[in-house]
Amino acid sequence: IWLTALKFLGKNLGKHLAKQQLAKL
């Protein structure tokens, strides 16, 4: 359960950070 939860959070964080990086450009 924890591994899948961490993977899910990791994907969401990746998308969020990617959006922030695109916004800066």
Swiss-Prot record:
Q: Where does this protein reside within or beyond the cell?
A: Secreted
What's this protein's family per the entry? Belongs to the cationic peptide 04 (cupiennin) family. 05 subfamily.
Q: Which UniProt keywords apply?
A: Amidation, Antibiotic, Antimicrobial, Cytolysis, Hemolysis, Secreted, Toxin
Distribution of this protein across tissues and organs: Expressed by the venom gland.
* Signal peptide residues on this chain, from the entry's feature table: none
- List, in alphabetical order, the Gene Ontology terms for molecular function in this entry: toxin activity
Determine if Secreted is one of this entry's keywords.
yes
Record PTM Leucine amide, positions in chain = 25
- This one is known as Toxin LyeTx 1
Q: Which domain of life is it from?
A: Eukaryota
What is one process in the GO biological process aspect for this record? defense response to bacterium
**One GO term describing the cellular component:** extracellular region
The entry's function note states: Has antimicrobial activity against Gram-positive bacterium S.aureus (MIC=3.79 uM), Gram-negative bacterium E.coli (MIC=7.81 uM) and yeasts C.krusei (MIC=26.3 uM) and C.neoformans (MIC=13.2 uM). Has hemolytic activity against rabbit erythrocytes. Forms pores in lipid bilayers in vitro; pore formation is reduced when cholesterol is present in the bilayers.
